[in-house]
């Protein structure tokens, strides 16, 4: 037998300890670095979302926002708002005046229709005056010539021909037979259009008309409907820019025109911005743009606004206005119901697998299926929920066939069930065997031992699974897309009265805005606001579960 002699190197144990210490420090550093990287990644990803989402609550609200809040939600001081509306209307009036004067020479169809209307009204006026037949015939013939000459001037793109036709109209301005009649409108229109002819390039009238339409649209988006106009049916068209950031985008659209030009032959077109002053150079509309630029603040009166009601208000006009109250309530309902469905079933399943089933082939197969179920794509759960809960099962119990909170909660319950089973199973296994042995030694049955000893001791670990399940259920979109979600909804009260109806949720509404027609570009603050609200809601639910878990753990330790 060969005996190994003890080491005669007195430094070897010290070297091993130093090596082990160095390895420990390396792994500790790597672990700390990983944690820092994860924290940094969270900050990089979440900070911009939370920052931009906060603009849904804290922003500079304009007078249009205060008007919308008063009319739709009954908030604010009506008398102060009325005074404010009068003040901004006075500042805006010159804008409408400049638009009207310029558009008279551009909207030729309106001018021609006005000329025809004057001709008809003049004929009716002659009938009411009982004008002699011969004089009536002469005056109607004269009015017809005035109408035709004015129409010829309007339709002409040659300045000389237009001035000549207008001259034929104004030649009769001093005719005493036309004094005090409707026909004087021809002379007023001829003088106004003569000024247009002097200042506008008639050959570019079609180009001016298109650009004028863009200017009108931008002004309408800024200030809302013009005073005296019919109220638009869509809520989003009833008000101007309700926020200063929205107003700045509309101001840019008003003050600059976007054009796509070919810089080099054979190369893709490039977008350039042309100032509106350059686009309307030499016309009476040029002063409008510096006027709006300099007095935009007076026209909209932006004020710092803390819109905390964003979290309780119903959405209006497809999330264009309003808040996320129904989305928060729908998310809470469907998440809580899903956990209520999954938690008892998950704990019972875990208890059976640990306490009763042993470790045979069937049990190993069941565990494999549970692990596989945890990796199934959520869209598959959504399709299963549609086929089984929505179409087959719930109608069998008298529920209406269709999407509902109940169907969505059952589907999400199946989705998070593997998470709860695995977490509960590990929590039950982690309970020291001495707890169970002591209870059984005192004469407790296996069921009573589990309910009174094992389950309370495993509760902190089970709550860990609940925390993970809440985060998963609240953020899912695909399953509720088929089983529970609608794009727009209102707050139902009491909440349990709506379990058989579809609901809107934060996750699905964020998706709906993102894929909607232009809505994400028009109101990005609402999309980020929904994401921020979802993050905060999940964080609050997780913190609540963590506090409950901590309290349970302290009670188990006797603190």
Regions found by a protein language model. Name each.
Residues 24-28, 345-385, 422-423, 557-559:
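Cytoplasmic-entry segments and transmembrane alpha-helices of multi-pass inner-membrane transporters
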Residues 318, 481-535:
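Interhelical loop and adjacent transmembrane-helix boundary motif
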């Amino acid at each position: 037998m060969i005996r190994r002699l003890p080491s005669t190197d007195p430094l070897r144990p010290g070297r091993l300890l130093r090596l082990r210490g160095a390895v420990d420090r390396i792994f500790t550093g790597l672990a700390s670095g990983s944690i820092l990287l994860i924290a940094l990644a969270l900050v990089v990803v979440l900070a911009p979302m939370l920052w931009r989402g906060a603009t849904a609550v804290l922003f500079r609200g304009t007078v249009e926002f205060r008007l919308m809040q008063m009319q739709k939600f009954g908030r604010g001081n009506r008398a102060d708002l009325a005074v404010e509306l009068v003040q901004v209307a006075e500042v805006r009036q010159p804008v409408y005046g400049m638009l009207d004067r310029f558009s008279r020479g551009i909207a030729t169809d309106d001018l021609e229709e006005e000329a025809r209307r004057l001709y008809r009204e003049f004929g009716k006026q002659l009938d009411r005056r009982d004008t002699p037949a011969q004089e009536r015939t002469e005056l109607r013939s004269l009015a017809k010539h005035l109408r035709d000459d004015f129409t010829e001037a309007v339709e002409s793109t040659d300045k000389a021909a237009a001035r000549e036709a207008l001259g034929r109209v104004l030649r009769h301005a001093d005719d005493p037979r036309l004094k005090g009649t409707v026909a004087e409108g021809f002379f007023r229109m001829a003088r106004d259009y003569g000024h247009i002819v002097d200042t506008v390039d008639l050959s570019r009238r079609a180009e001016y008309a298109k650009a004028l339409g863009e200017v009108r649209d931008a002004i309408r988006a800024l200030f809302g409907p013009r005073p005296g106009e019919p109220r638009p049916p869509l809520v989003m068209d009833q008000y101007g820019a309700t926020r200063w950031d929205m107003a700045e985008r509309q101001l840019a659209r008003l003050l600059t025109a976007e054009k796509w030009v070919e810089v080099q032959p054979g190369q893709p077109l490039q977008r350039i911005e042309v100032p509106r002053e350059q686009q309307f150079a030499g016309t009476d509309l040029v002063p409008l743009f510096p006027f709006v630029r300099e007095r935009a603040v007076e026209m909209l009166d932006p004020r710092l606004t803390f819109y905390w009601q964003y979290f309780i208000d119903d959405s209006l006009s497809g999330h264009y206005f309003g808040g996320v109250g129904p989305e928060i309530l729908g998310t809470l309902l469907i998440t809580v119901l899903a956990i209520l469905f999954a938690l008892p079933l998950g704990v019972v399943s875990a208890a059976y697998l640990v306490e009763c089933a042993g470790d045979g082939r069937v049990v190993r197969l069941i565990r494999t299926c549970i692990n596989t179920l945890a990796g199934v794509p959520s869209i598959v759960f959504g399709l299963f929920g549609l086929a089984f809960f929505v179409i087959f099962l719930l109608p069998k119990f008298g529920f209406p066939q269709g999407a509902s909170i109940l169907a969505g909660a059952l589907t999400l319950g199946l989705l998070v069930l593997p998470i709860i089973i695995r977490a509960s199973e590990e929590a039950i296994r982690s309970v020291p065997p001495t707890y169970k042995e002591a209870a059984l030694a005192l004469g407790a049955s296996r069921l009573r031992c589990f309910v009174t000893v094992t389950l309370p001791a495993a509760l902190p670990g089970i709550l860990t699974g609940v925390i993970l399940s809440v985060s998963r259920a609240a953020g899912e979109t695909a399953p509720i897309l088929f089983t529970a979600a609608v794009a727009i909804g209102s707050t139902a009260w009491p909440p349990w009265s709506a379990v058989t109806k579809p609901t809107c949720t934060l996750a699905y509404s964020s998706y709906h805005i993102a894929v909607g027609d232009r809505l994400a570009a028009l109101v990005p603050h609402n999309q980020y606001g929904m994401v921020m609200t979802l993050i905060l809601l999940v964080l609050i639910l997780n913190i609540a579960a963590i506090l409950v878990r901590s309290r349970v753990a302290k009670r188990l330790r006797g603190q």
